[in-house]
């Protein structure tokens, strides 16, 4: 068996998982919306500035249940990546997402989020329009939203840009996804002044689904087809649907105040030492 074939089916090191999470053919958030949900109707705009195409959101049906679905999505090709700003949302994207979540709360619809972003966009315009406050406001409002929230990290989960949609009751991750405060490249450059030490950085950062599940930061690791989700996207769809259904069943009989208290406790426990 040649080395390239072995590499294509065996992913073990954290850095290999980073590479798989960033793979150009990895299914996008839009792909999962189109293939997991029925009757999706997309909503646009934050009612303050404009529409951010890095975040897609709207209402849909999941197994005959009305849901609000939101995705931070990259593009499936170069042109679409440019249109979607390579999955880096502007503040109007986060405000749009929050608008849809508050609507979901009003109509008692569960919220399902898909996350795949290297981080929030850090351009001058984004800062001028309040990127920091948009993310902070999402964290605050999601912590007390009176409807179930399920978030799934499907690729990269980068920094506050990802966290803005992952203050959730259930956090799921694909087994080759990563979720961290910054990229391994950024970590190596800042801490060691050497961007070439990315593999070492990925090892010490504990960014994999398996590590984060062990620490209690995420709830479920979703298996991927051998070699990654891009090897068999339809099989990945089936695996994700099953875990979404499991998460919804676990939450369907929880009273609202209990749900909010458990969500609060979940995040307060992160980082505590026994």
From Swiss-Prot:
GO terms for cellular component: acetyl-CoA carboxylase complex. GO terms for biological process: fatty acid biosynthetic process; malonyl-CoA biosynthetic process. Its EC number is 2.1.3.15. Pfam families: ACCA (PF03255). The keyword Glycoprotein does not apply. It comes from the Bacteria. Pathway: Lipid metabolism; malonyl-CoA biosynthesis; malonyl-CoA from acetyl-CoA: step 1/1. Residues 2-250 form the CoA carboxyltransferase C-terminal domain. It catalyses: N(6)-carboxybiotinyl-L-lysyl-[protein] + acetyl-CoA = N(6)-biotinyl-L-lysyl-[protein] + malonyl-CoA. Coiled coil: none annotated. GO terms for molecular function: acetyl-CoA carboxylase activity; ATP binding; carboxyl- or carbamoyltransferase activity. The keyword ATP-binding applies. It is found in: Cytoplasm. Keywords: ATP-binding, Cytoplasm, Fatty acid biosynthesis, Fatty acid metabolism, Lipid biosynthesis, Lipid metabolism, Nucleotide-binding, Transferase. Belongs to the AccA family. HAMAP family: AcetylCoA_CT_alpha. Component of the acetyl coenzyme A carboxylase (ACC) complex. First, biotin carboxylase catalyzes the carboxylation of biotin on its carrier protein (BCCP) and then the CO(2) group is transferred by the carboxyltransferase to acetyl-CoA to form malonyl-CoA. Acetyl-CoA carboxylase is a heterohexamer composed of biotin carboxyl carrier protein (AccB), biotin carboxylase (AccC) and two subunits each of ACCase subunit alpha (AccA) and ACCase subunit beta (AccD). This is Acetyl-coenzyme A carboxylase carboxyl transferase subunit alpha. It comes from Clostridium botulinum (strain Alaska E43 / Type E3). The lineage of its organism: Bacteria, Bacillati, Bacillota, Clostridia, Eubacteriales. The gene is accA.
């Amino acid at each position: 068996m040649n080395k390239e074939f072995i590499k294509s089916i065996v992913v073990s090191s954290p850095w290999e998982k980073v590479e798989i999470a960033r793979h150009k053919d990895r299914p996008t958030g839009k792909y999962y919306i189109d293939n997991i949900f029925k009757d999706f109707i997309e909503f646009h705009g934050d009612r303050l500035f404009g529409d951010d195409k890095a975040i897609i959101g709207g209402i849909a049906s999941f197994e005959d249940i009305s849901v609000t679905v939101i995705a931070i999505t990259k593009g499936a090709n170069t042109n679409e990546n440019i249109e979607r700003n390579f999955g880096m949302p502007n503040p109007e994207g986060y405000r749009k997402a929050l608008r849809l979540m508050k609507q979901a709360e009003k109509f008692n619809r569960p919220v399902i989020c898909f996350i795949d972003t290297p981080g929030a966009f850090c351009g001058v315009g984004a800062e001028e329009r309040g990127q920091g406050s948009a993310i902070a406001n999402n964290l605050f409002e999601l912590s007390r939203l009176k409807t179930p929230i399920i978030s799934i990290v499907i690729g990269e989960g980068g920094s506050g840009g990802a966290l803005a949609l992952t203050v959730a009751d259930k956090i799921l991750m694909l087994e080759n996804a990563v979720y961290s405060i910054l990229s391994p490249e950024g970590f190596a450059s800042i801490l060691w002044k050497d961007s070439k030490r990315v593999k070492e950085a990925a090892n010490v950062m504990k960014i994999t689904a398996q590590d984060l599940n062990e620490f209690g930061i995420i709830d479920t690791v979703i298996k991927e087809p051998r070699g990654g989700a891009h090897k068999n996207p339809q099989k990945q769809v089936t695996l994700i649907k099953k875990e979404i259904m499991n998460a919804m069943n676990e939450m369907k009989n929880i009273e609202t105040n209990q749900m909010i208290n458990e969500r609060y406790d979940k995040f307060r426990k992160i980082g505590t030492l026994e």
